Amino acid sequence: MSENQQALNHVVSMEDLTVDQVMKLIKRGIEFKNGAQLPYEDHPIVSNLFFEDSTRTHKSFEVAEIKLGLERLDFDVKTSSVNKGETLYDTILTLSALGVDVCVIRHPEVDYYRELIASPTITTSIINGGDGSGQHPSQSLLDLMTIYEEFGHFEDLKVAIAGDLDHSRVAKSNMQILKRLGAELFFAGPEEWRSQEFADYGKFVTIDEIIDQVDVMMFLRVQHERHDSGAVFSKEDYHAQHGLTQERYDRLKETAILMHPAPINRDVEIADHLVEAPKSRIVQQMTNGVFVRMAILESVLASRNAN
C-alpha cells in the first residue's frame, strides 16, 4: 500500500471522512490512473450487492476489483433469499460468515449501513454504493478527483449544483465535502425540489444568475423514481427553465467545466449535443470512477490487514 494512503474500516458517508482522508484517496486514485499497480497475493473476496439499478457504480466497482486482482463473489438479488423475505442484515451476516472481506452495497433505504457496521458479529467491511437519497461517497470522490485534476485545488472555486437537489445523494455528499474543502457553493433548480438543508452550505440562485460565474457547473438527473406524484414539468419546460441549453453553455467561462453524475436525461438536464462538448468532463468522471474506487478498496482492505 502507498505510504500516502490512510486506511478506513468502512466508506459509507462523506461526513465520516476527514479532508486529509479525502485528499489521500483522490491522490491515490490519480496514482492508479497513472499506472500504479497493487497485486493482492492473499485474494481478498469482494461481493457487490445492488438492490437498485446501476450501470456506472456497479460496473466501475467490478472493473476496479478486476484491476486490483480481487476475487469477486457475484450476488444476484433476483435469485437470492432476499426474495424469500431475508433481511439485508441477515444477508450480510451470511456473507460475513462465509469469509467475504468487503461488501459494496446499494440499497434504497437511507442509512441502511448503520445497523451493519454497528454489529459485533458482522466482520465484513461496508462500502456504500448509494443509500436512497442519502449518501454516495464513491461518486463524490470521483467528482472531487475530476475537479482536482482540472484545477489542482478546491479553495475558492465556485461550484454550482443544479437540478433535483432534494432527491440527490450526489448533491448531499458533494455539498458537505466541497464546503469543507473551501469551495463556494450555489444551488439551482426548481424550488419544489430544494430543502432548507442546502442553505447551510451555499446560496440558492437561478441557473441564469450564476452560469457565467462558476468554475464547475454540475447538473443532476431528474429522479422520477423518487417522486411521489406525477411530473411537475414537461421535459421541454424543465430544459428551458433549468437545463443546459446552447445559450447557457456559451455563457460559461472559458475555463469552466461541465459535470453530471449520470445517467443523463438528454435534452432535459443537458442538451443532447452538449453532453460531449469540449467543456464536458462527464466521460472523464466515469473513467475516474474506476481509479478512485480502486483507492477506496485498497484503503478498506489495508484497514482489515492492519487489524
Swiss-Prot record:
- Database matches in Pfam families: OTCace (PF00185), OTCace_N (PF02729)
Q: In which pathway does it act?
A: Pyrimidine metabolism; UMP biosynthesis via de novo pathway; (S)-dihydroorotate from bicarbonate: step 2/3
| Keywords associated with the record | Pyrimidine biosynthesis, Transferase
The catalytic activity, as recorded, is:
carbamoyl phosphate + L-aspartate = N-carbamoyl-L-aspartate + phosphate + H(+)
Q: Which domain of life is it from?
A: Bacteria
Q: Which GO terms describe its molecular function?
A: amino acid binding; aspartate carbamoyltransferase activity
Listed name of the protein: Aspartate carbamoyltransferase catalytic subunit
Species annotation:
Streptococcus pneumoniae serotype 19F (strain G54)
